[in-house]
Curated annotation (Swiss-Prot):
It comes from the Archaea. This is UPF0173 metal-dependent hydrolase rrnAC0300. The keyword Magnesium does not apply. Keywords: Hydrolase. GO terms for molecular function: hydrolase activity. Belongs to the UPF0173 family. Gene3D superfamilies: Ribonuclease Z/Hydroxyacylglutathione hydrolase-like. It holds the Pfam family Lactamase_B_3.
Length: 239
């Protein structure tokens, strides 16, 4: 599995021959990539705020993985998409898309947007992406990446996502103000019991400017064994 960070919460994930793009927003200071250089098979949207769907219109006709509310908003405003299941998915569900299995879990955040469902974008979420189907009855080897979306610290990270979905790596927001800051994000990494942790959603605009070393130090302070990788924009990590 290859993970490429394009700044903010935008990630490109390659699972065998399937390319996924999460929260496309290339108008951020971390990346020089032209969004039209990418040709994902599926776009995954954690929620409908502008800094997470800002470039989704570049991928009209692409497969779309999001809640029904966000799917309808994208169709109403950006054109036609091939929504997974015809109308999207929802929290707790797992879908098989190409070579990847994607489970959507809730995130503690807001999601205000005007949709045909009303003045709400539904619950925001995060994605657990794996190369094998999640199960409790097999010891098959798997590689699993958790994109937490915009969120605060949740006990579900400790009680559900970590022990049952068993991510090897997690990208967590650390910018504070709108999401977790370095201290809470470090606790999330510890609770998730991952081998690799990546900070995201920081240094995009003034309210979320931080020192990433604070996050590194906080992870160490929890006693976690996770390796923290502060990627440069457009950098790829092989998981």
């Amino acid at each position: 599995m290859e993970l490429t960070w394009y700044g903010h919460s935008t990630w490109h994930v390659t699972v065998d021959d399937t390319e996924l793009l999460i929260d496309p927003f290339f108008d951020n200071p971390h990346t020089d990539t032209d969004p039209e250089e990418l040709g994902p098979d599926y776009v995954l949207l954690t929620h409908g705020h502008a800094d997470h769907i800002g470039d989704v219109d570049r991928y009209e006709g692409c497969g779309l993985v999001a809640t029904p509310e966000v799917v309808e908003y994208c169709k109403d405003n950006f054109g036609e998409f091939n929504a997974v299941g015809g109308m999207g998915m929802n929290l707790g569900g797992t879908v098989e898309i190409g070579d990847a299995f994607v489970t959507m879990h809730r995130a503690d955040h807001t999601n205000g947007m005007e949709t045909s469902y009303g003045a709400s974008g539904g619950m925001p979420g995060g994605f657990i992406i794996s190369d094998t189907k999640p199960t409790q009855v097999s010891d098959a080897e798997s590689t699993t990446f958790y994109h937490a979306g915009d969120t605060g610290l949740m006990t579900e990270m400790r009680d559900v996502i970590g022990p049952f979905l068993e991510p090897d790596a997690a990208a967590v927001p650390v910018g504070d103000h709108f999401t977790m800051g370095p201290m809470q994000a470090a606790v999330a990494v510890d609770w998730l019991d991952v081998d690799h942790a990546f900070p995201m959603h920081y240094d995009t605009f003034p309210p979320i400017e931080i020192e990433t070393q604070d996050f590194v130090n906080e992870v160490k302070g929890t006693g976690s064994d996770a390796d923290v990788h502060v990627l440069d924009g457009d950098e790829t990590f092989e998981l």
